[in-house]
Curated annotation (Swiss-Prot):
It is an enzyme of class 2 (transferase). It comes from the Bacteria. Pfam families: tRNA_Me_trans (PF03054), tRNA_Me_trans_C (PF20258), tRNA_Me_trans_M (PF20259). The record marks H137, Q345 as: Interaction with tRNA. It is found in: Cytoplasm. This is tRNA-specific 2-thiouridylase MnmA.
Amino acid sequence: MSNKKKVILGMSGGVDSSVCAYLLLKQGYEVEGLFMRNWDSMLNNDFLGNENISQDICPQEQDYQDALEVANKLGIKLHRVDFVNEYWNDVFKTFISEYEAGRTPNPDILCNKYIKFKAFSDYAFNNLGADYIAMGHYAKVTDGRLYRAKDQNKDQTYFLAQLSHEQLKRVLMPLAEFSSKEEVRKIAQEQDLITASKKDSTGICFIGERKFTKFLQNYIPMQPGDIVDIRTNKKLGKHEGCFYYTIGQRKGLNLGGQAEPYYVCGHDVKKNILYVAPSSDLSYLTSDALLATGLTLNHDDFDHNNLSAKFRYRQQDIPVTIELLPNNTIKVYYPSESQAVTPGQQVVLYEGQKCLGGAVIEKIYYKGSEKTYL
């Protein structure tokens, strides 16, 4: 009987997880792949905005075929599991209810917390006898603690910050030390893997590319209302539904005849009003503090005087100070100010290379006053 440690690898049919399979084999693990099916367009009424609905083979099925071909090439077993119900209940219902409340959720964060590192890991450990699970994320995990990847451009710790130390204790991230995606593709080419030049997946986690406003209309009916200048309270036009617009958005407002472009600065969901402000006045987007809830901290030990944060993916870190409050609540102060910090999104805290954790943004402040129009 083999004394090799068994790793169950999330295989998506993309180049990252394909190369992970090769690397883990090379490192001496017993490797098996697990492909997740998390979305069913027919069952989930996903018709509007879905350009794949009439294709002979849906992208998800093509991904499975690619993962299978890679698994066969590397001589490993590929399992397939269906988490459509879990995704709907734990990720998508929250996603929709947040939009209905006029907030901007991040499905990738929910997806990692409840699917990849909960449903997937439970299945791998309980059904497939895994010692470890592995994922093709660009992030570093050491002893269950989360750190930034070497490739800062691809670093995905922002999406993993809600994971607990417990969830990460038996996780391997083989791509942590790569300097660029090109290095990963080069290995795939050298090993003649079918996914070597496959494009990165984009769009909503496990759902894919959609025409977003149309896609939301499958689940949230259109509710046209007034677009109002927040400074003058003057009606400037009509919107299709508050839920379809995000804070800071400039395109798609159809406000012709104005002296300058406008941007979305807030909404009143109950009154169905979309608030806008002119581009020359960014004060309505600016904030210097926030309150966030549901804080998960992955590191216990950190220097309170050397913290930075991101409020959205790929944003440059900005220096912050924090105030830890009861009930996993946190106040974050950023005196250098930031724009378009949005309720429903996540604040992620860092100390150098350490990703300390994250929380969901609830309230935004500027010069001591809450911005209630968000």
